[in-house]
């Protein structure tokens, strides 16, 4: 324990010596096997103000309700399949079970309507078992919903909807009943998985750990994983990881990328994007068609009829932009400044970047999402 305390003190001293670009190891990597697990359940929300499922269109809601009543010894008469339960809705319940969650702890849950319920506002979720992918029950959910949206409708058909009223959350709405087995304390090694695979970052993580703890303690498995030796004692292993996760490492620079969202017009250009020598010009043609009909009025005694004569005007306007030139190794700042000078819109910038990529002048990955 004394040695571990000395290592912690040394870690703090090393961390203080790094520059502003260094990041904690806990922020750029995770421990293999230490992760959250998804849970899901099916249940009923009751207490709705007439905004529940229309059970004639969602028969599974009525079936679920009848099954619940039968568990309390209440037998529903035959032929009640047309009963309308306006205050009940069938819902899906899901949550993330954190790593090392213990029985008795609570987790937040999300509740979403499955049927045609208009709103879950004001409802309460009845006891719902939540299962993992293995089919075992790991938590029990129940509680009053918090719904951020609402829905209102008038008799004349007018309607207003704010946000999504058919989904809500219950903070701390599920109680953990079973822990998920973890291999955290098994074996004499641990694997650190980088959030973003990068060979440079993996090498720097290995170098930093070995610099602090000694040669051979850490070994890179590939560009995304680093294996480190660890104590077998659980308490010492926790102290050991506390040291590692507070190490500050300077991550490697990301690959040059340009991200384009064609639906929203969003363009993100990475810091390392450069352009080879190229000349670019971009203009747009605007065609305007206007209708200005003329009324033809005949003379008083001519016997003719008044007629409307269509008259169309077509105008084409070409916006001319000067050609701008990119020199060798042009940086992001120079690209943005040059494009802004010609007044290019986001759509124009997309076309320019795509053309530069096709010409082989854009030294980056062009990703369209």
UniProtKB/Swiss-Prot annotation:
Transmembrane segments: none annotated. It holds the Pfam family FlgI. GO terms for molecular function: structural molecule activity. The basal body constitutes a major portion of the flagellar organelle and consists of four rings (L,P,S, and M) mounted on a central rod. It comes from the Bacteria. The gene is flgI. It comes from Pseudomonas syringae pv. tomato (strain ATCC BAA-871 / DC3000). This is Flagellar P-ring protein. It is found in: Periplasm; Bacterial flagellum basal body. GO terms for cellular component: bacterial-type flagellum basal body, distal rod, P ring; outer membrane-bounded periplasmic space. Its main location: periplasm.
């Amino acid at each position: 324990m004394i040695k571990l305390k000395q290592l912690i003190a040394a870690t703090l001293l090393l961390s203080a010596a790094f520059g502003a670009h260094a990041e904690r190891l806990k922020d750029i990597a995770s421990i293999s096997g230490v992760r959250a697990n998804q849970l899901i359940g099916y249940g009923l929300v009751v207490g709705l103000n007439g905004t529940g499922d229309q059970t004639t269109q969602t028969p599974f809601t009525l079936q679920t309700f009848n099954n619940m009543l039968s568990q309390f010894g209440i037998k529903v008469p035959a032929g009640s399949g047309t009963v309308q339960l306006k205050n009940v809705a069938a819902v899906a319940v899901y949550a993330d079970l954190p790593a090392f969650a213990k029985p008795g702890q609570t987790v937040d849950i999300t509740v979403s309507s499955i049927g045609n319920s208009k709103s879950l506002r004001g409802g309460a979720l009845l006891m719902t078992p939540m299962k993992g992918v293995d089919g075992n029950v790991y938590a029990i959910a129940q509680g009053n919903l918090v719904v951020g949206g609402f829905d209102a409708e008038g008799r004349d058909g007018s309607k207003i909807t704010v946000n999504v009223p058919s989904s809500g959350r219950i903070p701390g709405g599920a109680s953990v009943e079973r822990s998920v087995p973890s291999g955290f304390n098994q074996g004499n090694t641990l694997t650190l998985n980088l959030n973003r695979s990068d060979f440079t970052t993996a090498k720097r993580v290995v170098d930093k750990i070995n610099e602090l703890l000694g040669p051979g303690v850490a070994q890179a498995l590939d560009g995304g994983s680093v294996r480190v030796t660890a104590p077998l004692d659980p308490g010492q292993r926790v102290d050991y990881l506390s040291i590692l996760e507070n190490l500050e490492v300077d991550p490697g620079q990301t690959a040059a990328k340009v991200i384009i969202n064609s639906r929203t017009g969003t363009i993100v250009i990475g810091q390392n994007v450069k352009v080879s020598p190229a000349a670019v010009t971009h203009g747009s043609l605007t065609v305007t068609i206007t209708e200005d009909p003329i009324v033809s009025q005949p003379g008083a005694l001519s016997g003719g009829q008044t007629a409307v004569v269509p008259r169309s005007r077509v105008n084409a306007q070409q916006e001319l932009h000067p050609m701008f030139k990119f020199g060798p190794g042009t940086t992001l700042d120079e690209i943005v400044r040059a494009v802004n000078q010609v007044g290019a819109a986001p759509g124009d910038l997309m076309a320019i970047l795509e053309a530069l990529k096709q010409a082989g002048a854009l030294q980056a990955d062009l990703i369209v999402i």
